[in-house]
Curated annotation (Swiss-Prot):
Residues 29-86 bind DNA. Keywords: Activator, DNA-binding, Nucleus, Stress response, Transcription, Transcription regulation. Induction: By high-salt stress. Residues 137-157 are annotated as: Disordered. Transcriptional activator that binds specifically to the DNA sequence 5'-[AG]CCGAC-3'. Binding to the C-repeat/DRE element mediates cold or dehydration-inducible transcription. CBF/DREB1 factors play a key role in freezing tolerance and cold acclimation. This is Dehydration-responsive element-binding protein 1F. Its main location: nucleus. PROSITE patterns: AP2_ERF. SUPFAM superfamilies: DNA-binding domain (SSF54171). GO terms for biological process: glucosinolate metabolic process; regulation of gibberellin biosynthetic process; regulation of timing of transition from vegetative to reproductive phase; regulation of unidimensional cell growth; response to freezing; response to heat; response to water deprivation. SMART domains: AP2. The keyword Ligase does not apply. The lineage of its organism: Eukaryota, Viridiplantae, Streptophyta, Embryophyta, Tracheophyta. It comes from Arabidopsis thaliana.
Length: 209
């Protein structure tokens, strides 16, 4: 199918919805889908030779539902199908028959190909720095003085003394003299100033043949 032969939904403006429920829930551009429960999108198509509709399922995004619609109309109408996306003609799988169950299964599989990454299952969301994190100090979820008492009771006096000693050693580190081996290497012949080191690097790139 050539791109010139593809019929897109955006090329055919929708008719005004008669009932209020369809006016408020249907998508302004995509065909065959409408909003349900505020954040879900449902999809269904009508068979060309019958008045019955084929239910294609509920999806978390409008794009996924629109892709399911394109799979169904490609199976039912072929080259005369009005698609929501131009690349659906070659990108989506086409059901091998017009059986509603087959169309529904292939449409659902095709829609999953376009599921956003942030909606995939199995993703672990790490807490932010400002979130409350349960460190396992107790089964309760209290806050304020109660949680502070649990945190303080989990540390003994020896732990505080060890932490205090470590902090004092870190504070005294910059005041201590460097080791003798380091001082012996710091002779006038091998000490570079910052400017000399800069020119040393520049000579590698400024050498002329």
């Amino acid at each position: 199918m050539n791109n010139d032969d593809i019929i897109l939904a955006e090329m055919r403006p929708k008719k005004r919805a008669g009932r209020r429920v369809f006016k408020e829930t249907r998508h302004p551009v995509y065909r065959g889908i409408r909003r349900r429960n505020g954040d879900k999108w449902v999809c269904e198509v009508r068979e060309p030779t019958h008045q019955r509709r084929i239910w294609l399922g509920t999806y978390p995004t409008a794009d996924m539902a629109a892709r399911a619609h394109d799979v169904a109309v490609l199976a039912l109408r072929g080259r005369s199908a009005c698609l929501n996306f131009a690349d659906s003609a070659w990108r989506l799988p086409v059901p091998e028959s017009n059986d509603p169950d087959v169309i529904r299964r292939v449409a659902a599989e095709a829609a999953e190909m376009f599921r956003p990454v942030d909606l995939e299952s199995g993703i672990t969301v790490l807490p932010c720095a400002g979130d409350d994190v349960d460190l396992g100090f107790g089964s309760g979820s209290g806050s304020g003085s109660g949680s502070e008492e649990r945190n303080s009771s989990s540390y003994g006096f020896g732990d505080y003394e060890e932490v205090s000693t470590t902090m004092m050693r870190l504070a005294e580190g910059p005041l201590m003299s460097p080791p003798r081996s380091y001082m012996e290497d710091m002779t006038p012949t091998n000490v570079y100033t910052e400017e000399e080191m800069c020119y040393e690097d520049m000579s590698l790139w400024s050498y002329r043949y």
